[in-house]
Amino acid sequence: LMLRGELDESVLVAFTGDEEKDSAGAIEIMQMLGRMECLVGKALVLDVTNEGWEDEAAFSIENDHGFDIITGYHIVELLQASGTSCVFVHEAEPDETWEYSKGSSSDLPGIPCLSLCLPVCGNMHGDDGVLLRKSSVIPYEDILRKLANAVF
């Protein structure tokens, strides 16, 4: 999406690490946004998950935090319009969304956020890799583009 110029110019893409170690990358991003006095409308955390694999879902929405009811309605509308099978897990395993939703200080309150995950099969933390359904890639990319570019 980035290489093809399919993301709005207002979209900030940050590659973070250390999710398994207290989400240090997400904390660093929050601190940087605070220093730069950036107003952020939403954060989308991209990840893999075992949720939805057995249901053959193309993607899952997990750990949604801080969206108002109208924005939530618009997100559901986008999901329904996609016509793609997805799984919704309001409170899944902790991830970076928990950091983004807390904010970094009184200067930078929590950011509405969710995790957009690709369902996989296998040990996500092992050395053997995981299985990903090829049929999930295009719908995942499509909903990511729509969510990232959406103005709610």
Question: Could you tell me what each predicted segment is?
Answer:
Residues 1-65, 94-102:
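Acidic/histidine-rich catalytic neighborhood of metal-dependent amide-processing enzymes
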Residues 57-152:
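Active-site-adjacent substrate-binding region
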